[in-house]
């Protein structure tokens, strides 16, 4: 494409050195002159957008903030679509139309930062980050979430809560069938699922998210990565400070035998009777409902699901184990797709200072701890993983945090991600349905993605 930027790389240490040196003066200035304030004499009104929150913790967080900042700032929680793709479309329509009043603070997917920043839709908050979090900004957060907020050597968001794909399994049923540990490979998962479904009369062996949407993209990527395949050179492990951060990658690698093998393994779950045919239309709530009702042995899910086990279902937390995702062959590294949400400030917000005050509040240790305990939302602050009060109380916090640090892998880091995602969603789903072969799928995607971002 005509405005494509060449790929650039820098190590985390170089990123810190360049960022710290370039912002030395900015740090002294702090947030002065970095955004507008309230209009008139009343409180500044801040509109905050996010999807539905069944845990109730988000509305409680907003209510707490409003009580503590009464007369100064008032935050309105605007509920958006629960479907990530639809939420993204709603936001981009507002950005392009210059909607008024604008959404001031966006609770956004970790993958949106580069595209929003490249289009000038969100505020560069680098000065604010260094002023309020000290020159060692990345050390305050888990490496994967803070990396997701960076683009073009700047910070565009604050990590709010984080996610990574987990394998939930019926620990009680595996033990009853003679298995002492979770599967390490997909073949082991099939073997265990086949035996447990027969022994315990469970309907399905494995449920996951295979529908034609962003969740289906995430699941397809995990199958590809865990077979040794890749999509873009920017699909890197983001927890190693000595490995490069790819600012704008453009080398397409999906058209490989390893990528095809990953999609074949995904399809084989249906062909071998481990997963139901209906999984081609499953989203998070469908797979969660099946597992929570006792109808599945294994579930590929997110950390927040742990808090739901036992609520209006037959499975309680004591029956559930948590493991990393299986791989194609024993000894291969396991990767989980980095999920989670950042807080971005609209570049057209008339109340940037007030918006920043809310962002800092919502991402502060007290609020992250509250949402971790009440909703199993994984914190982004490293210090909270040493807080035994929440680690001991919510087991998924420690296990999920370890997986994020060791196994988290980002989706393609590129300003063209929305275009790439739509192609991946359609083709991954067609492969899962058996409408195209895995080989045809990856060859098709190789050509399409080269046209978009190559």
Predicted regions and their residues:
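Extracytoplasmic/periplasmic substrate-recognition and gating elements
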Residues: 67-74, 96-97, 175-177, 245-252, ...
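Short helix-initiation/N-cap motifs at beta->coil->alpha
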Residues: 79-90, 186-191, 278-292
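Glycine-centered hinge/linker elements that transmit conformational signals in sensory
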Residues: 192-195, 199, 234-279, 325
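Hinge/lid segment of periplasmic solute-binding proteins
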Residues: 99, 110-164, 219, 223-226, ...
């Amino acid at each position: 494409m005509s405005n494509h930027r060449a790929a650039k790389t820098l190590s985390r240490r170089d990123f810190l050195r360049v960022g710290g040196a370039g912002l030395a003066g900015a740090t002294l200035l702090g947030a002065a002159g970095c955004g507008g304030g309230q209009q008139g004499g009343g409180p500044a009104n801040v509109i905050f957008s996010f999807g539905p929150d069944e845990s109730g913790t988000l509305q409680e967080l907003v209510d707490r903030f409003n009580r503590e900042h009464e007369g100064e700032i008032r935050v309105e929680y605007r509920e958006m679509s629960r479907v990530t793709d639809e939420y993204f479309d709603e936001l981009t329509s507002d950005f392009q139309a210059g909607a008024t009043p604008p959404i001031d603070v966006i609770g956004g997917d970790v993958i949106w930062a580069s595209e929003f920043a490249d289009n000038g839709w969100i505020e560069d908050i680098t000065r604010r980050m260094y002023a309020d979090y000290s020159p060692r900004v990345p050390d305050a957060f888990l490496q994967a979430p803070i990396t997701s907020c960076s683009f073009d050597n700047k910070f565009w968001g604050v990590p709010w809560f984080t996610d990574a794909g987990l394998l939930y399994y019926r620990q009680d049923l595996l033990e009853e069938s003679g298995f002492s540990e979770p599967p390490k490979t997909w073949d082991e998962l099939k073997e265990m699922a086949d035996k447990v479904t027969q022994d315990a009369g469970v309907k399905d062996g494995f449920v996951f998210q295979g529908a034609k949407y962003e969740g289906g993209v995430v699941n397809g990527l995990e199958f590809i990565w865990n077979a040794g395949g890749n999509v873009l050179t920017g699909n890197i492990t983001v927890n190693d400070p000595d490995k490069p951060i790819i600012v704008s990658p453009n080398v397409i690698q999906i058209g490989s035998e390893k990528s095809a093998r990953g999609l074949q393994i995904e399809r084989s779950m249906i062909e071998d009777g481990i997963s139901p045919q209906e999984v081609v239309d499953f989203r998070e709530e469908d797979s969660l409902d099946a597992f929570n009702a006792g109808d599945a042995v294994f579930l590929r899910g997110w950390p927040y699901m742990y808090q739901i086990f036992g609520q209006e279902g037959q499975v309680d937390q004591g029956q559930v184990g948590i493991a990393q995702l299986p791989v194609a062959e024993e000894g291969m590294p396991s990767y989980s797709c980095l999920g989670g949400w950042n807080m971005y400030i609209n570049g057209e917000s008339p109340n940037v200072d007030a918006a920043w005050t809310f962002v800092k509040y919502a991402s502060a240790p007290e609020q992250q701890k509250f949402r971790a305990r009440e909703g199993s939302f994984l914190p982004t602050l490293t210090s909270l993983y040493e807080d035994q009060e929440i680690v001991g109380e919510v087991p998924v916090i420690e296990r999920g945090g370890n997986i994020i640090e060791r196994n988290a892998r980002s989706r393609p880091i590129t300003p063209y991600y929305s275009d790439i995602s739509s192609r991946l969603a359609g083709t991954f789903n067609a492969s899962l349905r058996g409408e195209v072969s895995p080989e045809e799928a990856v060859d098709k995607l190789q050509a399409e993605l080269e046209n978009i971002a190559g």
